[in-house]
């Protein structure tokens, strides 16, 4: 009888010990020193009808300690205009979080956008990481730029794309003002990218396909990208990205919209993930390659990398 009566007490003590064990304490795997700020690409958004642009990524980062802010800038405009819009939000985030700096992560056109902020206000930026960003331009943008400037074809196409940008802005939680698809095109083609790089060279490789400076003006630079336009036959976006990949010349490795060498910035973590341009943000709806690590895991690993670098 005595032995039986002591069993509940023993269980209670055991459970209390387990609760105190570090094995089940909240993980800090993604708990960076500074907040993580996500910046979307061309025709991007923060959230539409409950669907995140960064599909499942913010919640996965927050789960293990990261402080994450999702921004929204103009869906279509130049890198400088988008950069100024992002800078305003970064200043608000710094004030709100109480931290003096942030870690920027930009996808696609978000890459040049975060570079602008890091270049003009390095005091606010701990790191700048680009994902599938066309730092030296995109062959797809070069292909579209062959449409004669000022032509009826250009006017019709830019009008349609601007309307799409306006619709995305309307449906999302942000209000990003007017759309400027021609500004985006000028920023993302090879000539426009070269002009931007001349003004803001931080982290850009000096060789055709090498790495850039890892740290400039106190800002750490990183990048990664995919190299497989077709990754999941169930993903409806693969057809579009497979077609757009045909605009790349001489068998250039690409993710459907951005060449792998063009994606290089600072420390190149990897440029050959089995991912296409939308897989890089876990779209569409997480339909990515079954033969590659989850994009969400890549972001979590990078947050841990930043944490270990005291960023």
Swiss-Prot record:
Q: Which InterPro entries match?
A: AB_hydrolase_1, AB_hydrolase_fold
Its EC number is: 3.1.1.3
Q: Where does Ca(2+) bind?
A: 235, 279, 283, 287
In the record's cofactor note, how is the cofactor described as bound?
A: Binds 1 Ca(2+) ion per subunit.
Q: Which residues form the AB hydrolase-1 domain?
A: 35-280
Q: Would the keyword Signal be found if you checked this record's keyword annotation?
A: yes
Substituting residue 209 to S results in: Loss of lipase activity
**What controls its activity?**
Na(+) increases lipase activity. Inhibited by diethyl p-nitrophenyl phosphate and 3,4-dichloroisocoumarin (DCI).
Residue ranges that the Swiss-Prot or TrEMBL entry lists as coiled coil = none
What is the pH dependence? Optimum pH is 8.5-9.
Instruction: Kindly list the GO CC terms recorded for this protein.
Output: extracellular region
Question: In Gene Ontology terms, what is a biological process of this protein?
Answer: protein transport by the Sec complex
The record's GO molecular-function terms, alphabetically, read: lipase activity; metal ion binding; triacylglycerol lipase activity
Provide the primary localization. secreted
Instruction: Describe the thermal dependence of activity.
Output: Optimum temperature is 50 degrees Celsius.
The keyword Disulfide bond is assigned to this record: yes
Alphabetically sorted, this entry's keywords are: Calcium, Disulfide bond, Hydrolase, Lipid degradation, Lipid metabolism, Metal-binding, Secreted, Signal
Main function = Catalyzes the hydrolysis of triacylglycerol. It also exhibits some esterase activity with p-nitrophenyl acetate and Tween 80 as substrates, however the lipase activity is approximately eight times the esterase activity. It shows a marked specificity for the 1,3-oleyl residues of triolein.
Q: What is this protein called?
A: Triacylglycerol lipase
Name the species this protein comes from. Answer: Pseudomonas aeruginosa (strain ATCC 15692 / DSM 22644 / CIP 104116 / JCM 14847 / LMG 12228 / 1C / PRS 101 / PAO1)
Which gene specifies this protein's sequence? lip
């Amino acid at each position: 009888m005595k032995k039986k009566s002591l069993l509940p007490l023993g269980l209670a003590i055991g459970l209390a010990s387990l609760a105190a064990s570090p094995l089940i304490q909240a993980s800090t795997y993604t708990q960076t020193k500074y907040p993580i700020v996500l910046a979307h690409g061309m025709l991007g958004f923060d959230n539409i009808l409950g669907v995140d642009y960064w599909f499942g990524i913010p919640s996965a980062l927050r789960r293990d300690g990261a402080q994450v802010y999702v921004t929204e800038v103009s869906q279509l405009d130049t890198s400088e205009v988008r950069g100024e819009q992002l800078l305003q939000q970064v200043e608000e985030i710094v004030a709100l979080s109480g931290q003096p700096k942030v870690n920027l992560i930009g996808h696609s056109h978000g890459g040049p956008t975060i570079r602008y902020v890091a270049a003009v206000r390095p005091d606010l930026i701990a790191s700048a990481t680009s994902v599938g960003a066309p730092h030296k331009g995109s062959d797809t943008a070069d292909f579209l730029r062959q449409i004669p400037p000022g032509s009826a074809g250009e006017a019709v196409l830019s009008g349609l794309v601007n309307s799409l940008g306006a619709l995305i802005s309307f449906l999302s939680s942000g209000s990003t003002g007017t759309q400027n698809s021609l500004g985006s095109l000028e920023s993302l083609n090879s000539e426009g990218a070269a002009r931007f790089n001349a003004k803001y060279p931080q982290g850009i490789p000096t060789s055709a396909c090498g790495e850039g400076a890892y740290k400039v003006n106190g800002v750490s630079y990183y990048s990664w990208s995919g190299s497989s336009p077709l990754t999941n036959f169930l993903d409806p976006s693969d057809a579009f990205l497979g077609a757009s990949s045909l605009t790349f010349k001489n068998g250039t490795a690409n993710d459907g919209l951005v060449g792998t060498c063009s994606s290089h910035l600072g420390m190149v973590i990897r440029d050959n993930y089995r991912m296409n341009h939308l897989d890089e943000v876990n779209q569409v709806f997480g339909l990515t390659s079954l033969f590659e690590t989850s994009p969400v895991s890549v972001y979590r690993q990078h947050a841990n990398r930043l944490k270990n670098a005291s960023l």
